UniProtKB/Swiss-Prot annotation:
Record key words, sorted: Ribonucleoprotein, Ribosomal protein, RNA-binding, rRNA-binding
Stated name of the protein: Large ribosomal subunit protein uL24
Protein source organism: Methanosarcina mazei (strain ATCC BAA-159 / DSM 3647 / Goe1 / Go1 / JCM 11833 / OCM 88)
An annotated Gene Ontology molecular function: rRNA binding
Entry keyword DNA-binding: no
Length: 122
């Protein structure tokens, strides 16, 4: 079984390459977002990984202030799609606008998964 070697380089090109070539179980760690003040106090942690079904508030960008449920999470792109956050293509079709999870705040957690509940509570 191969081990994941920790990143030791300071070079930006190697930092970027490590992110782009990371396996999916490592990319999951890049999908963290801040918890709202109430959730942070309740669970005793400041952040959690975003999953489908969470309710998030967008904190940065064109859709700042928009709140909606997470439709999908793309580990390959490192983005999430949120209800009500859409772009219109030239032909008129609407597509979900990809959002970086670092630009959102989780306001309500989807707790159907028991393992998630135990991993968030500390």
């Amino acid at each position: 079984m191969s081990e994941v070697i920790e990143m030791v380089s300071k070079q930006p090109r190697k930092q970027r390459k490590a992110r782009y070539t990371a396996p999916l179980h490592i990319r999951q760690k890049f999908m963290g977002a801040r918890l709202s003040e109430a959730l942070a106090k309740q669970y005793g942690t400041r952040s959690a990984a975003v999953i489908t079904g969470d309710t998030v508030k967008i904190m940065r960008g064109d859709f700042k202030g928009t709140e909606g449920k997470v439709q999908s999470v793309s580990l390959m792109d490192g983005t999430i799609a949120v209800d009500g956050v859409i772009s219109t293509k030239v032909d008129g079709t609407e597509v979900p606008r990809p959002i970086n999870p670092s630009n959102v705040m989780i306001t309500k957690l989807e707790m159907k998964d028991g393992r998630r509940a135990s991993s968030i509570k500390k």
